[in-house]
């Protein structure tokens, strides 16, 4: 079934049992938006609500089995890009924006690490290997970094250069270091008037995590060190996310 196009499309887009399906993520987003309507803009709420009704159309799973599938994916892509645009243009840069940005970049960082692991694990994290650009193209496209990679790096070998872009490149918006530095900026804003010892502990915890990446020299990284770097960063960031939620959100 995992090789069946219809199955995969429905699983990713509208499977009620898949916690990370687009449908379930939109439902959760709407619940969050409804609970904080006084903190978000009318435009943002209306867009999320519209997307919610689109995803809950009972005919959607059937349409994904027809030639309408491509137009549905195109519409979803457009609507999610619009959501990003509305969020950026209309949201005041207060605490709501701060929490939203921290959550977004934690998720982005974890996605980058997971996708990177998925491509390096099958080749034993071999940084001196000679996998061709076709192998790395899918990873780079998934992270919206293929074009930047082509412009920034010369030809082979790619294995170590891809790590440089997706983990250590401060100019790449989906890199691990870029997302960690943005989280750090928002944490500074969030904690600037907070004297709670728990807040200081949390900020120090994140500072150690960021320094771990910051002071690693990818030029001399070994295969095993890369494997451990990705694994440890993922574990530490997940733990930070849990601790952050416990401090600020009582339902966690």
PLM region spans:
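Alpha-helical transmembrane segments and their helix-helix packing motifs
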Residues: 1-252
């Amino acid at each position: 079934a995992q090789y069946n196009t219809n199955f995969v499309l429905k699983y990713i887009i509208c499977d009620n049992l898949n916690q990370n399906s687009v449908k379930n993520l939109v439902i959760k987003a709407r619940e969050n938006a409804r609970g904080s309507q006084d903190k978000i803009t009318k435009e943002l709420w209306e867009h999320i609500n519209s997307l919610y009704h689109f995803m809950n159309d009972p005919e959607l799973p059937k349409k994904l089995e027809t030639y309408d599938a491509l137009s549905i994916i195109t519409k979803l892509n457009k609507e999610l890009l619009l959501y990003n645009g509305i969020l950026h243009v209309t949201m005041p840069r207060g605490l709501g924006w701060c929490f939203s940005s921290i959550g977004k970049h934690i998720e982005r960082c974890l996605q980058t690490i997971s996708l990177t692991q998925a491509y390096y694990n099958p080749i034993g994290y071999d940084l001196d290997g000679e996998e061709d650009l076709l192998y790395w193209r899918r990873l780079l496209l998934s992270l919206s970094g293929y074009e930047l990679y082509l412009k920034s790096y010369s030809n082979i070998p790619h294995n170590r250069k891809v790590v440089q872009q997706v983990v250590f490149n401060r100019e790449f918006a989906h890199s691990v270091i870029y997302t960690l530095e943005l989280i750090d900026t928002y944490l500074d804003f969030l904690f600037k008037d907070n004297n709670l010892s728990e807040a200081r502990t949390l900020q120090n915890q994140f500072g150690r995590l960021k320094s771990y990446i910051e002071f690693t020299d990818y030029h001399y990284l070994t295969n095993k060190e890369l494997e451990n770097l990705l694994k440890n960063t993922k574990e530490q960031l997940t733990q930070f996310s849990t601790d952050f939620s416990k401090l600020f959100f009582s339902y966690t």
